[in-house]
Amino acid sequence: MSSQYSNVENLSPQTIRQVMRELQEMETTPPEGIKVLINESDVTDIQALIDGPAGTPYAAGVFRVKLTLNKDFPQTPPKAYFLTKIFHPNVAANGEICVNTLKKDWKPDLGIKHILLTIKCLLIVPNPESALNEEAGKMLLERYDDYSQRARMMTEIHAQPAKCGAGAHGDDKDDDGPSTKKHAGLDKKLQDKKKEKLLKEKKRMLKRL
């Protein structure tokens, strides 16, 4: 999903400055549950880590998302993708995100922060009516418990902080510093057991489908 080419040269210096300013502001004062990953050599390739919101099947997961700015930005919206695998009605198999803010409701003054907050909101309130993943949309409407179980299982398998490249355990609110390393081995054993359990659940669930 990483971009094969950059649109930096096609963006106006004013747009580049505005984007960098906004990213630096978010780095200094991050929105709750969102951490931007700045690529200073290519501001058209923006990535961020979004914490799965509490009370959703995505809770305890960390999801890496990517925004790709095209040459007409901000007149036209960027494309947005989940780089972390996720089971969600509004996320296609290739990770592309469908949300009105990036389509008919786009306005040039919305900005990067607004987009990332909208994506986080989509984890709280999916929109099955405009589903890119029809199976997830149908399941959410007709069999919510099954949808929730599948989404939670995908989160536990694919959206663990280490796998998403969060890299900095110190950013986690529950982290108490040195003790994290002490318990790393135990955490790994627990994760392995959890994976075995999830795989069994997955097989059982797939038989029912």
UniProtKB/Swiss-Prot annotation:
The active site is at C98. GO terms for molecular function: ATP binding; ubiquitin conjugating enzyme activity. Transmembrane segments: none annotated. GO terms for biological process: anaphase-promoting complex-dependent catabolic process; cell division; exit from mitosis; protein ubiquitination. InterPro entries: Ub_conjugating_enzyme, UBQ-conjugat_E2_core, UBQ-conjugating_AS, UBQ-conjugating_enzyme/RWD. This is Ubiquitin-conjugating enzyme E2 S. Its EC number is 2.3.2.23. SMART domains: UBCc. Catalyzes the covalent attachment of ubiquitin to other proteins. Acts as an essential factor of the anaphase promoting complex/cyclosome (APC/C), a cell cycle-regulated ubiquitin ligase that controls progression through mitosis. Acts by specifically elongating polyubiquitin chains initiated by the E2 enzyme vih/UbcH10 on APC/C substrates, enhancing the degradation of APC/C substrates by the proteasome and promoting mitotic exit. The keyword Cell membrane does not apply. Keywords: ATP-binding, Cell cycle, Cell division, Nucleotide-binding, Transferase, Ubl conjugation pathway. SUPFAM superfamilies: UBC-like. Residues 162-209 are annotated as: Disordered. Residues 200-209 have a biased composition (Basic residues). Residues 169-199 have a biased composition (Basic and acidic residues). Pfam families: UQ_con (PF00179). Residues 14-160 form the UBC core domain. It comes from the Eukaryota. Belongs to the ubiquitin-conjugating enzyme family. PROSITE patterns: UBC_1, UBC_2. It catalyses: S-ubiquitinyl-[E1 ubiquitin-activating enzyme]-L-cysteine + [E2 ubiquitin-conjugating enzyme]-L-cysteine = [E1 ubiquitin-activating enzyme]-L-cysteine + S-ubiquitinyl-[E2 ubiquitin-conjugating enzyme]-L-cysteine. Pathway: Protein modification; protein ubiquitination.
